[in-house]
Amino acid sequence: MKRTYQPSRIKRKRTHGFLARKKTTGGRRVLKNRRRKGRWRLTV
């Protein structure tokens, strides 16, 4: 059986990266909330 997690650096960056977050309204909200919470890392 094929597992669900098939690591790929490119895919990881494209879906969860900083620029990907910056593009959408929801993503910007994510960044804002993580900044407010004081997360050490904003994105992957």
Curated annotation (Swiss-Prot):
Gene Ontology BP, a term: translation
Membership in a protein family: Belongs to the bacterial ribosomal protein bL34 family.
Entry's Gene Ontology cellular component terms: ribonucleoprotein complex; ribosome
Natural source organism: Thermosipho melanesiensis (strain DSM 12029 / CIP 104789 / BI429)
Keywords: Ribonucleoprotein, Ribosomal protein
Region (Disordered): 1-44
An annotated Gene Ontology molecular function: structural constituent of ribosome
Pfam families xref list: Ribosomal_L34 (PF00468)
InterPro entries attached to this UniProt entry: Ribosomal_bL34, Ribosomal_bL34_CS
TM stretches of this protein: none
UniProt-recorded name of the protein: Large ribosomal subunit protein bL34
Protein encoded by which gene: rpmH
